[in-house]
Amino acid sequence: MVSNSSPTSSRFSSLRSMLQKRWPAALLMLGLILFPFIFGRITGSPVTEGAPKFWQGQLIVVFIFAVYAMSYDLLIGYTGILTFGHAAFFGGGAYAMALFLTHVAPDFTDAYDIVIGGLEITGVVMLIIGTLLSLITAILLGLLFSAVSVRVKGHYFAMITLAMAEAVNILSKATDFVEWTGADEGLHGVPVPMWINPTQNRLTFYYIALVFAVLMYLFARRVVDSPTGKIFVAIRENESRVRMIGYNPAAYRTAAFVVSSVIAGLAGGLYSLWTVSATPTMTGVGTTIDALLMTLMGGIGTLTGPMLGAAVLEIFGHFFYQWFGARWPLVFGLIFIALVIFLPYGIVGTWRLRSDQWKRAWQRFRKPREAAAD
């Protein structure tokens, strides 16, 4: 029997199927791309001033912390590794970028820079080198943490990672390196090229942060959907079985740490450019707790869940601070408890598990009402 379907119709059907699955993501991307202009139109303010500029800044923070939380999910959600030292990767990347631009990179202010097509070429090169240093620093820290995970597991490992992260935090505050790191005060006024300056060219920074978030998500998605990602999940479910079928769990845990640390370190490097600073707070346990909260709110083992959790924490945190002042963490804590009770798998995780059940319940609810209306 000969099939009547042509290759062209097959391609169109596969494209249609892909669009049906991906249209929410495409719509979200379109909305984020147009957001500065739409919001400027609504408020009647220029895109580079007032409320549009402020909310660009809020979303920049969301993009960066969405990537950071997603990197944490690769460990706790996909590989089953609970760590309290994730801030070391984020802060390490931030300090690597800030230290290089402040103390090592040549002066790339207007007087010394080469400008071609509106881009400061020296500044671009320095940013690339700083990014590579953030990446290398994150890899080294990831290898260090993974070396410990070979010998210690479970809650003991979580406590050791907390101690290791605290060591990084103490190092960042050490007065022995005050001329380099600023000790408790941190580094401030990190030189940033004019074309990416978050104050004077925030719209450019907004789109760079958006592209960064998309690329990091695609990279993480590629990893978790790959055979290596399947081994990550298998280690989470039953490490002994993974070892029995011939795989080396230690090697895959190391890979998970390196991938996670690289993503977190790059997010930290971008955050140092956004804040034009690097401070001990970035390496503190509070920054790790932020990633944990974002992941739990959005849904462990989902990638998109932690990104949504970052948006909820940052945006609602802003409004709660406006409404409740210094008491906003208490209010947010109560809401978080309610989320854990009613959405035990996080927003995205619970939706994936129970959306069909909720849809069927809604249909059963609508049928009697529609029949009565007829």
Task: Name every feature range the model reports, one short phrase each.
Residues 2-374:
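Transmembrane alpha-helices and adjacent helix-loop boundaries
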